[in-house]
UniProtKB/Swiss-Prot annotation:
GO terms for molecular function: rRNA binding; structural constituent of ribosome. GO terms for cellular component: cytosolic large ribosomal subunit. Pfam families: Ribosomal_L6. It comes from Chlorobium phaeobacteroides (strain BS1). The lineage of its organism: Bacteria, Pseudomonadati, Chlorobiota, Chlorobiia, Chlorobiales. GO terms for biological process: cytoplasmic translation. This is Large ribosomal subunit protein uL6. This protein binds to the 23S rRNA, and is important in its secondary structure. It is located near the subunit interface in the base of the L7/L12 stalk, and near the tRNA binding site of the peptidyltransferase center. Coiled coil: none annotated. Keywords: Ribonucleoprotein, Ribosomal protein, RNA-binding, rRNA-binding.
Length: 179
């Protein structure tokens, strides 16, 4: 049995969960999320806990068991406390600023990059060299943060670029002078 899938999910007091027509809906103080369920797993709600079980022992059922347990857990955490990712910008003249609904990035190109985030995602710039991406959908927060990072990935020689706050950039030594 899946080690992750067999653990029950504790239901937070503020969160409400319901299953209708093979769609699980989770609502809380931060918003609502929905996820379509696959036929390989069933979800039971009892005693303030959510249990995910699989219908058989096929390889796909075992894979979906752990996946859907974590998806539901992330949905519950998202609607109660939310998710955020912090990005740091390194480089001379590299900066970010929030302009209306756009994120304006100056990253050493001949032009500025304007990025419009999805409506469910909030982007903040506490200072010109950091960006905070937050929202209730963990996958969407990670996807938007990865998209922003892809505009200028950190390079290994000087470390210039956009990186996650918890990311370690392996540095390389430059060319050494000849004889």
């Amino acid at each position: 049995m899946s080690r992750i899938g067999k653990m029950p999910i504790k239901l937070a007091e503020q969160a409400k969960i319901e299953i209708k027509d093979n769609v699980i809906s989770v609502s809380g103080p931060k918003g609502n999320l929905e996820q379509r369920l696959v036929p390989e797993v069933t979800v039971d709600i009892a005693d303030g806990q959510v249990a995910v079980t699989r219908i058989d022992d096929s390889k796909r059922s075992r894979a979906m068991h752990g996946l859907y347990r974590m998806l539901i857990s992330n949905m519950l955490e998202g609607v109660t406390s939310g998710f955020s990712k912090k990005l740091l910008i390194n480089g001379v003249g590299f900066r970010a600023e929030k302009k209306a609904e756009f994120l304006a990035l100056t990253l050493g190109y001949s032009h500025m990059i304007y990025f419009k985030a999805p409506e469910e995602i909030a982007i903040e710039c506490p200072d010109p060299t950091s960006i905070v991406v937050s929202g209730i959908d963990k996958a969407l927060v990670g996807q938007v943060a990865a998209k922003i990072r892809s505009f200028r990935k950190p390079e290994p020689y000087r470390g210039k670029g956009i990186r996650y706050s918890d990311e370690f950039v392996r540095r390389k030594e430059g060319k050494t002078a000849g004889k």
